[in-house]
Amino acid sequence: VLSSTDKSNVKAAWDKVGGNVGEYGAEALERMFLSFPTTKTYFPHFDLAHGSSQVKAHGKKVGDALTNAVGHMDDLPGALSALSDLHAYKLRVDPVNFKLLSHCLLVTLANHLPNDFTPAVHASLDKFLASVSTVLTSKYR
């Protein structure tokens, strides 16, 4: 459960991300594909080369979904219901991949926001991404 401090930390950090949400989302995806090559199997139709327009477009989708989640931290299940259905029933993404992408997002944010990425902010973002991952995998049960 996200505390009021966690929510405040997440909102403040996400405000710093601002218009870079798509760029950071794409960078996190690239990190994931490089660090965890098995994740590429979900994207056989993508050009996974650095700077690929398909990775950039999907990175923007990831970033926009997280922006939506940040705006609805009190109702993540409601805000992410359609996305949860998509990943569970249509795409059948292995739940572990959400943890891998979350890790890559944290690394990306730490890289771009070094002065703002305090231990407290890191912990809050980690809890937030874990909550998002839990919601996205809730329909698997």
Swiss-Prot record:
<dbReference type="GO" id="GO:0005506">
    <property type="term" value="F:iron ion binding"/>
</dbReference>
<feature type="modified residue" description="Phosphoserine">
    <location>
        <position position="102"/>
    </location>
</feature>
<dbReference type="GO" id="GO:0072562">
    <property type="term" value="C:blood microparticle"/>
</dbReference>
<dbReference type="GO" id="GO:0005344">
    <property type="term" value="F:oxygen carrier activity"/>
</dbReference>
<feature type="modified residue" description="Phosphoserine">
    <location>
        <position position="124"/>
    </location>
</feature>
<keyword id="KW-0007">Acetylation</keyword>
<dbReference type="Pfam" id="PF00042">
    <property type="entry name" value="Globin"/>
</dbReference>
<feature type="modified residue" description="Phosphoserine">
    <location>
        <position position="138"/>
    </location>
</feature>
<feature type="modified residue" description="Phosphotyrosine">
    <location>
        <position position="24"/>
    </location>
</feature>
<dbReference type="GO" id="GO:0004601">
    <property type="term" value="F:peroxidase activity"/>
</dbReference>
<dbReference type="GO" id="GO:0020037">
    <property type="term" value="F:heme binding"/>
</dbReference>
<feature type="modified residue" description="N6-succinyllysine; alternate">
    <location>
        <position position="16"/>
    </location>
</feature>
<feature type="modified residue" description="Phosphothreonine">
    <location>
        <position position="134"/>
    </location>
</feature>
<feature type="modified residue" description="N6-acetyllysine; alternate">
    <location>
        <position position="16"/>
    </location>
</feature>
<dbReference type="InterPro" id="IPR002339">
    <property type="entry name" value="Hemoglobin_pi"/>
</dbReference>
<dbReference type="InterPro" id="IPR002338">
    <property type="entry name" value="Hemoglobin_a-typ"/>
</dbReference>
<comment type="function">
    <text>Involved in oxygen transport from the lung to the various peripheral tissues.</text>
</comment>
<feature type="domain" description="Globin">
    <location>
        <begin position="1"/>
        <end position="141"/>
    </location>
</feature>
<keyword id="KW-0597">Phosphoprotein</keyword>
<dbReference type="GO" id="GO:0005833">
    <property type="term" value="C:hemoglobin complex"/>
</dbReference>
<dbReference type="InterPro" id="IPR000971">
    <property type="entry name" value="Globin"/>
</dbReference>
<feature type="binding site">
    <location>
        <position position="58"/>
    </location>
    <ligand>
        <name>O2</name>
    </ligand>
</feature>
<comment type="subunit">
    <text>Heterotetramer of two alpha chains and two beta chains.</text>
</comment>
<feature type="modified residue" description="Phosphothreonine">
    <location>
        <position position="137"/>
    </location>
</feature>
<feature type="binding site" description="proximal binding residue">
    <location>
        <position position="87"/>
    </location>
    <ligand>
        <name>heme b</name>
    </ligand>
</feature>
<feature type="modified residue" description="N6-succinyllysine">
    <location>
        <position position="7"/>
    </location>
</feature>
<feature type="modified residue" description="N6-succinyllysine">
    <location>
        <position position="11"/>
    </location>
</feature>
<keyword id="KW-0408">Iron</keyword>
<feature type="modified residue" description="Phosphoserine">
    <location>
        <position position="3"/>
    </location>
</feature>
<comment type="similarity">
    <text>Belongs to the globin family.</text>
</comment>
<dbReference type="GO" id="GO:0042744">
    <property type="term" value="P:hydrogen peroxide catabolic process"/>
</dbReference>
<protein>
    <recommendedName>
        <fullName>Hemoglobin subunit alpha</fullName>
    </recommendedName>
</protein>
<feature type="modified residue" description="Phosphoserine">
    <location>
        <position position="131"/>
    </location>
</feature>
<keyword id="KW-0349">Heme</keyword>
<dbReference type="GO" id="GO:0043177">
    <property type="term" value="F:organic acid binding"/>
</dbReference>
<dbReference type="GO" id="GO:0019825">
    <property type="term" value="F:oxygen binding"/>
</dbReference>
<feature type="modified residue" description="Phosphoserine">
    <location>
        <position position="35"/>
    </location>
</feature>
<feature type="modified residue" description="N6-succinyllysine">
    <location>
        <position position="40"/>
    </location>
</feature>
<dbReference type="InterPro" id="IPR012292">
    <property type="entry name" value="Globin/Proto"/>
</dbReference>
<keyword id="KW-0561">Oxygen transport</keyword>
<dbReference type="GO" id="GO:0031720">
    <property type="term" value="F:haptoglobin binding"/>
</dbReference>
<keyword id="KW-0813">Transport</keyword>
